[in-house]
Amino acid sequence: MLDLTVLIDNNAAFLDKELLTEHGLSFYFRVDGLACLYDLGASDKWLNNANKLGIHAEEVDHLILSHGHKDHTGGLSTFLQVNKSAKIFVSDKAFKYKYLTYRHEKPRDISSDSSLFAKYADRFVLLTEDCLLSPHVYLIHNRVFEHRLPVGNQFLRIVVDGEEKPYIPHDEVALVIRIDDGIVILSACSHS
């Protein structure tokens, strides 16, 4: 059985005024006896909401980061302070590059804090291919692009060897959770 809770997004507070919102995303789910987080939003607000919902971050077994943009990894520092043991599954490319958005007047850096990866390297599992996390949870690492990318990607850039290039979402990780009557797919930003 799957138990899934949205911890942070940009709309959750309309249901409960005590829950915080932000441009970002974080899910908590339980399956196969595991407590997991998928993304951490842009800040530590996910932890406020987890506490209000009775979810204990220190008991999380696995954290999956969907990609290297800070609206999904911004709460990582807080998570690492609160949870001392969970493995963190992420694409091998998520912390490798600098990511920029041009949705505003000036370009903004939306990269994850790579110093956390360096400091806590032993906690990270770098994905280069799909991975079976548990009997019912599959991590799907993005690899082939044989379709048009979403229109929103036109505002995103990646810096490779000092040169800006169009963002190709090679760092995305989606979740597939098998349940009794089908599957649940979590794709945080769906850049690909």
Located regions from the model:
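Short Pro/Gly-enriched beta-strand edge/turn motifs at strand-loop
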Residues: 1-14, 153-161
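General small-molecule cofactor/ligand-binding pocket signal
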Residues: 5, 89, 123-128, 138-140
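Active-site metal-binding motif and surrounding structural segment of the metallo-beta-lactamase
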Residues: 45-90, 95-96
